[in-house]
Amino acid sequence: MGVATLPAGGLNWLAVWRRNYLAWKKAALASILGNLADPVIYLFGLGAGLGVMVGRVDGVSYTAFLAAGMIATSAMTAATFETIYAAFGRMQGQRTWEAMLYTQLTQGDIVVGEMAWAATKASLAGTGIGIVAAMLGYTHWLALLYALPVIAITGLAFASLGMVVTALAPSYDYFIFYQTLVITPMLFLSGAVFPVDQLPVAFQQIAAFLPLAHSIDLIRPTMLGQPIANVCLHIGVLCIYIVVPFLVSTALLRRRLMR
């Protein structure tokens, strides 16, 4: 991996973050509401419907159980959509990244800046769901504050994965495969909607490798005031999903942008 592929050092990536922020704030309200729509629909739809039939899960109401899962899910969704659709547009259609490379920025700076911006949007989305849950009495405000670092790390992990997909995709059409074959199954296998231990053993083993499952295992106990098991393991797995895809995407983008 060449030097130009890695971040140049310092805070150069902040220029990328700031550029994306300035473009986003023109339509900030619509963006925030869009990121909240799906998780809120899941929360009220499944919570009100299944909650009556299911009752309590792991000692708490099903809606409280679901709310914690939707916080992680909203962070995943926001980071994913930002790094595949929006970032791809900046790379392919607008050719913003190409223009950035004529400055002192490297591919690594661009990737770090895009990941940081996606994690910011993920944090806003996850916090938004958390605020709704706290207002409805399904968690405490202080618990939401404790969960913020995990929400941000979750955003970084899925942003890093999304950058790999963006680096590989020849067009927007290919993102549907990532959504339907990776993101949607992960939602149902990671314990967001129902406990992982209710799945067949084979699916439980798959869930053990999924970043969303580790995020939920950190966020849910925090939101519900329960002890957190295997904290170092969960954080370690999420960090792997941040670092390894980052290295892969920077290498792939070097070849793609230098053609």
Swiss-Prot record:
Q: What InterPro entries has UniProt attached to this entry?
A: ABC2_TM (IPR013525), ABC2_TM_bact-type (IPR047817), ABC_2_transport (IPR000412), ABC_transptNodJ (IPR005981), Nod_factor_ABC_transporter (IPR051784)
Q: List keywords of the entry alphabetically.
A: Cell inner membrane, Cell membrane, Membrane, Nodulation, Plasmid, Transmembrane, Transmembrane helix, Transport
Principal location listed in the UniProt entry: membrane
Domain ABC transmembrane type-2 stretches:
30-256
The disulfide bonds in this chain are none
Pfam families linked to this entry: ABC2_membrane
Membrane topology is: Multi-pass membrane protein
**Which Gene Ontology MF annotations are present?**
ABC-type transporter activity
Q: Where in the cell is it found?
A: Cell inner membrane
Q: Where are the transmembrane segments?
A: 32-52, 64-84, 116-136, 141-161, 174-194, 228-248
- GO process annotations (BP): oligosaccharide transport
Listed GO CC annotations: ATP-binding cassette (ABC) transporter complex
Q: Which NCBIfam families match?
A: nodJ
Q: Which family does it belong to?
A: Belongs to the ABC-2 integral membrane protein family. Lipooligosaccharide exporter (TC 3.A.1.102) subfamily.
What does it do?
A: Part of the ABC transporter complex NodIJ involved in the export of the nodulation factors (Nod factors), the bacterial signal molecules that induce symbiosis and subsequent nodulation induction. Nod factors are LCO (lipo-chitin oligosaccharide), a modified beta-1,4-linked N-acetylglucosamine oligosaccharide. This subunit encodes the transporter.
Its assembly, as annotated, is: The complex is composed of two ATP-binding proteins (NodI) and two transmembrane proteins (NodJ).
What is the name attached to this protein's record?
Nodulation protein J
Organism, by scientific name, is Rhizobium leguminosarum bv. viciae
Biological classification of the source: Bacteria, Pseudomonadati, Pseudomonadota, Alphaproteobacteria, Hyphomicrobiales
